[in-house]
């Protein structure tokens, strides 16, 4: 099978979150499974400098974007054992300091940028000598591709590919003023309301268009697939998703264990495994030293790596830490986002010197060191489509403390569910009090050496490799092709 993945970000070229990790790993997993896979993504600032092997393709296209015609160039990168990467080059849209925003402000032309990207994806799928049988779109930035392909099928594209849309986070839908629809050059009937077009309360909703027009819809965990059809977590699209539930599948993301590996990892201070755990204590001591916390094996170290957004449960985490930092624990945080939440963490660090270390931004090396050096990892999300950090934590023997929602509930086993297979701590109510109770439970686990060893070994044996995940995606592709 020939599969083209389209995503606004792909690791290691561009990344703001788990979307990039998933798409890069899925491309590799498809190649390893014997499929022909390629990925298309924008050429953002700095990629050419970091990857000098990029090659310009003798391919130029001029695409209609409303009343104007916009040019694009194409670059490619081939790497052994990996999906080929195609890069859409338009400096006016993609040569910027950020991918979606600068200084916490979204780019005003994001609708135009990613409508253009979607048109480039369709052009690539139709006219490259390598013709995909399936085009797999990721999130709102590529979600108009199924509608654009259907438009060209109506105009005579006889061997058009089937389409699959993966929703990584339903909260991000790509909603723009009605005038943005003109940029798509789609017929007026594609803007139809009532669940049969791209219209959403008088606005263009890119993700809704993908849900309506894609041949198949997947999301990144079985529980999240159920949750998004409810009014509580459907983000206003639950009705449309219920109408299209027959083509909706939940597939838990896999983990790239070549990247997230405790036995061979350049970022770790010392490697270790579930059979030889001594290296974990070394990583804890070196992490404490690195972030400026007192080096003390007896103090449980809690960590988090997260976008600072309400979805991630930052509000209840700050509330719980206010209480729990009065006990004998340490906390390290990495991430960026809401200025209000950044301020909250700075104030926490000022009030609890020697107990709290905060760093803003993203640092790949530090993220591995936090996963390896912490005893517990906090993920108190309000909702979580899949989540990857809890799976990274499990592989690193760092016990995840999670709210039982979405993929967190699918991947973590609490002691009360199955003592023999317990690998984490769950709580259910979205409150600071419930999270604080889970932290106290974790401290009690830490105080019993045999119990913490059991949790760590069970956690490290959990298997979320891509083998099962990619098989489920291939089944979806085969189903829509048949």
Outline where the language-model segments fall.
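Catalytic cores of nucleotide-sugar-dependent glycosyltransferases that transfer UDP/GDP/TDP-activated
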Residues: 1-482
């Amino acid at each position: 099978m020939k599969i083209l993945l389209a995503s606004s970000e792909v690791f290691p070229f561009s990344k703001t979150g788990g979307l990039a990790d998933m798409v890069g790993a899925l491309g590799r997993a498809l190649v390893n499974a014997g499929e022909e896979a390629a990925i298309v993504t924008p050429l953002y600032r700095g990629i050419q400098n970091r990857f000098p092997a990029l090659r310009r393709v003798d391919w130029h296209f001029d695409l209609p974007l409303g009343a104007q015609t916009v040019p694009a160039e194409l670059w490619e990168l081939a790497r052994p054992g990996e999906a080929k990467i195609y890069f859409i080059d338009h400096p006016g849209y993609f040569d910027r300091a950020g991918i979606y925003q600068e200084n916490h402000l979204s780019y005003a032309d994001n609708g135009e940028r990613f409508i253009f990207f979607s048109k480039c994806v369709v052009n690539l799928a139709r006219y490259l000598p390598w013709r995909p049988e399936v085009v797999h779109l990721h999130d709102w930035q590529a979600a108009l591709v199924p509608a654009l392909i259907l438009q060209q099928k109506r105009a005579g594209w006889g061997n058009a590919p089937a389409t699959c849309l993966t929703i990584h986070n339903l909260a991000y839908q790509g909603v723009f003023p009605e005038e943005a629809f003109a940029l798509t050059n789609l017929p007026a009937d594609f803007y139809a309301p009532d669940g049969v077009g791209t219209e959403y309360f008088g606005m263009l909703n890119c993700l809704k268009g993908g849900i309506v027009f894609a041949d198949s819809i997947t999301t990144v965990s079985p529980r999240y697939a159920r949750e998004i059809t409810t009014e509580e977590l459907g983000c206003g699209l639950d009705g449309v998703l219920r109408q299209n539930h027959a083509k909706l599948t939940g597939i838990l993301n896999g983990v790239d264990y070549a990247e997230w590996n405790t036995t061979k990892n350049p970022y770790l201070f010392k490697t270790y495994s579930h059979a030889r755990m001594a290296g974990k204590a070394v990583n804890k001591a070196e992490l404490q030293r690195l972030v400026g916390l007192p080096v003390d094996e007896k103090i449980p170290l809690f960590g988090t790596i997260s976008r600072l957004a309400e979805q991630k449960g930052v509000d209840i985490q700050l509330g719980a830490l206010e209480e729990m930092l009065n006990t004998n624990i340490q906390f390290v945080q990495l991430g960026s986002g809401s200025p209000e939440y950044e301020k909250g963490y700075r104030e926490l660090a000022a009030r609890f010197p020697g107990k709290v270390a905060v760093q803003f931004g993203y640092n790949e090396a530090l993220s591995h060191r936090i996963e390896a050096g912490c005893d517990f990892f906090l993920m108190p999300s309000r909702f979580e489509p899949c989540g990857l950090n809890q799976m990274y934590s499990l592989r690193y023997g760092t016990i995840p403390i999670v709210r039982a929602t979405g993929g967190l509930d699918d991947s973590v086993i609490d002691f009360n569910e199955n003592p023999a297979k317990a690998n984490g701590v769950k709580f259910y109510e979205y409150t600071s009090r419930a999270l604080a109770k889970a932290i106290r439970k974790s401290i009690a686990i830490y105080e019993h050496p045999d119990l913490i060893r059991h949790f760590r070994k069970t956690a490290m044996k959990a298997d979320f490799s891509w083998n099962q995940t990619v098989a489920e995606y291939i089944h979806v592709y085969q189903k829509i092709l048949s």
